[in-house]
Amino acid sequence: MPGSSLPHDSPVPPFPRVALVSSHLGRWPHRRTDWFAALSTACNQLLAVGSRLLFVAGTTTAPYLARCGKLFGHRVETLDSTGVSREDRDQLSVSNADVIIALAVGNRSRTRSLIQRVLEAPPESRPPVWFAHSTSLVSREIAEKWTTQGARPFDPSTRRWPDPPVAEGAIRLATDRMVESGDWLVHCTRESAGRWPGQPQNEYLDDLILGRNSADHSVQATLRKILVERRLRAVSRPVRGLPPAVSFSASPLEELLTRRVFRGHRGRWDFEPYGLAISRAWLAARGARPVVYRRPKDLRGDDPFEQPTESRGPRRRLDWTSEEEWRHPGDVDLSSLSASQGLVLVHRDSDLRYVAGFSRWPVLVLGHFRQDTSAVQ
């Protein structure tokens, strides 16, 4: 019920202590626009200004409460969780609350069991319970049961990032001749699980909570950011102490899709089919070099261009030599990369709208390659 606050018939004192509880958010916060819509609606429209948000370290909502307090005029009260197991920290918040608000509830989650125990207490001896009225956050089964037990639903504000506009004539597609004539090194990007490099933490959190377009950290948004900044940001190497670098692969463009491997232990593909192909000669002139593959026992540890030949995965050994990796120390400044020395890589035709108007380089749709990798369809 957007625009409303806690009703007068709720036994709630002024400036109530509020437990905001939730099942796990997942490793990709920017994907959960529904969750952040529920959080901001609860703080901005359900609660009166000056409410006290209960902070318990290690809970799903904890990273966002300080910013919610600043954005919506609430205080944040920290509860001491020393000696409390991570599994019981929502219980600590709930047991000290005048109001309980459930943002997301898994069907078999501890959050569901916790709220269910609260609702089984006599109405006069329990705090009011609210929950997000959205099937992506709370299942219909749970919502119906809790409503009959006296919990109240609230409607999160609707959010959807608008599709980026496509500028007429702003996309130049790569031709077969461009693909075949270039000696390309490929850099693939991926979605960002956290803030952008150099982005202030508070700005990142505000983007998520307020549902700004800049909260989109998908792989397409990451690629668009690279094109706008004309810079590939170096990342830290797995070996501690070695300088940040940008990695490339000498793998043929037409084989990229067939070379992808899903890494189950990481819950993701080893790379996404989005990024840039850059002239090998252009990169080499700026300090890029092929890595030196060494057996793990022969690694020196002080060579920024060395890479183990293999590593042990959860089920089998992983051979890294097939990546044919090159490495560039530090950021790659793309401002001097001419239109003939680079290609922008996207997976599907539907991705073209994300790079329209931003790319000075031709765009190659990798999905146009036939699965036998022999040609572009």
What are these regions (language model features)?
Residues 1-170:
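Glycine-biased, small-residue-rich flexible motifs in mid-sequence functional cores and linkers
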Residues 149-377:
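NAD-dependent ADP-ribosyltransferases
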